[in-house]
Regions:
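Conserved N-terminal subdomain of the carbohydrate kinase-like
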Residues: 1-85, 95, 214-225
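Structural motif
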Residues: 61, 82-85, 110, 126, ...
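Conserved phosphate-binding/catalytic region of the ribokinase-like
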Residues: 66, 79, 96-121, 134-225
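Glycine-rich phosphate-binding loops at beta-strand->alpha-helix junctions
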Residues: 89-93
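A short beta-strand/loop micro-motif in the catalytic core of glycosyltransferases
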Residues: 123-129
Length: 225
């Protein structure tokens, strides 16, 4: 305990650097063998977590954020199989930009966003239980909502898909892993209801690791079998 104030003293023993947010989605999509074209900004948001390794307990998080500006980009001319939007609502992506991207793309669209005013009629929207509770009632009835509920599984079109029972160490980035697997398996099978159980398996692997986690080749084989 710090003699200067009633707070713990931390001794640094190990430092790990991991990509998060949209970059975590990109890395996990690539782990499935998908070629990814990413639109993002140069500004960075750093989340520095302090973990007590003896008890696997997070003690503190410090956020370091550059001044965030809305994303400026030229739309790519290549052909793509899917559009994936990962938006933590930090200011990079406006609602107007999301609608523009969805209108531009001719194919399946997947959105994971903390915003509540989303184009639910034109895209698959992955949100968590807390985000779902904040939606307007008319949006809650959309057939395109994929609601992740942690240990209670995933709800889609009135059906619940059970979660995989594992020892949870850290849920950080698990939604990114779920989204990446969902996109890959949807492109493989063409059905969301077929892709969800596989995505649940991927998320179950992610939560057994600290911080954001990129699926290994072994993990991918486990998910897909």
């Amino acid at each position: 305990l710090n003699p200067e104030a009633p707070v713990p003293i931390l001794r640094e023993t190990e430092v790990k650097t991991q990509k998060g947010m949209a970059w975590n989605v990109r890395e996990n999509l690539m782990s499935f063998g998908i070629e990814v074209y990413i639109l993002t900004q140069e500004e960075r948001i750093i989340k520095r977590r302090f973990i007590d390794q003896r008890y696997n307990q997070q003690l503190l998080r410090v956020d370091i954020e550059d001044e965030v500006k809305p994303l400026e980009y030229d739309l790519p001319t290549e052909d793509f199989d899917a559009l994936v939007i990962s938006d933590y609502d930090k200011g990079f992506l406006t609602t107007k930009r999301i609608y523009e991207l969805v209108e531009w793309f001719d194919g399946p669209v997947f959105i994971d966003s903390k915003k509540t005013n989303l184009p639910v009629e034109y895209a698959y929207i992955k949100i968590n239980d807390d985000e779902y509770s904040k939606l307007d009632k008319e949006l809650k009835d959309s057939p395109n909502l994929i609601v992740t509920k942690g240990s209670q599984g995933v709800d889609y079109q009135g059906k619940n898909y059970p979660a995989i029972g594992v020892s949870v160490f850290d849920v950080c980035g698990a939604g990114d892993t779920f989204l990446s697997a969902l996109v890959y398996l949807y492109l493989l099978y063409g059905k969301i209801e077929t892709a969800i159980p596989y995505a649940n398996k991927a998320a179950a692997i992610a939560v057994t690791h600290f911080g954001t986690y990129v699926l290994s080749e072994r993990d991918v084989n486990e998910v897909c079998n």
